[in-house]
Structures are given as C-alpha cells and as structure tokens.
Amino acid sequence: PKANKLELLVDTGQLIGAIKRTSVFSNKASCLIVLRIIRDKLTVFAQDIDFSTSAEETLEVDFNGNEFSIGINGSLLLEILSCIDDGRTRLSFSEPSRAILITPENQSGNEELTYLLMPMTIP
C-alpha cells in the first residue's frame, strides 16, 4: 500500500511491553487487540468476552492524524516488533480495513525493513 497517509511513531520497547501486558486478557483464539489513537495517545486494548476480562494501557506517541482505531493480532505484531532493533517504530495506516505498514524509524545500513500486517474486524 502506498496511500498510507496516517503515521504513528512509538517507542518500540514501550509498545512491546504494553502488548504483552494487555494481550494476556485477549481472546486466546483470535489474539485480537485494538489500537486506539486519539491525538498523541495510543491506547492498547484487549478483551475476552467469554471470561469477562479486559485490559488497556496508554502510551505517548507522535501521530499526524486525529482519531483512529484498528484491530490486529497482538501475537503477530509482537513477532514483528521483536525484529525491529530501532528504538522507535513507525506504523502507517490508511483506513481500518487496510494493511498496516510497519518500519523502523531509522533504517540501518544497506537494508530496508518493511513489514505488512493485515487488520482484524473489531466486534
């Protein structure tokens, strides 16, 4: 996707920690977590309706939009983030039904990393 105009910059370690802590409360089959961005705040939210549990954590981020929510598989995002050595990660969005592009803020050396993550439907 080349039309991802919304960009979020977040501390990689903080995002990994927030996903690990909240995903404990996600549905074990889907691993669905919801990323809600309002101005410069990212809320990572997970819920397991079957067991009536939920968790959320809010992080400070840089975001060039106003408000955006997207559902993703938390375990897949963790796997991608574990491969990023940079201190900050860029997530690029266009709309909640389109793929997310994930890249390190600063590409190193002569290689360029780009990860693609498909969203999930938020119930």
Please state what every model-predicted region is.
Residues 3-123:
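DNA polymerase processivity clamps
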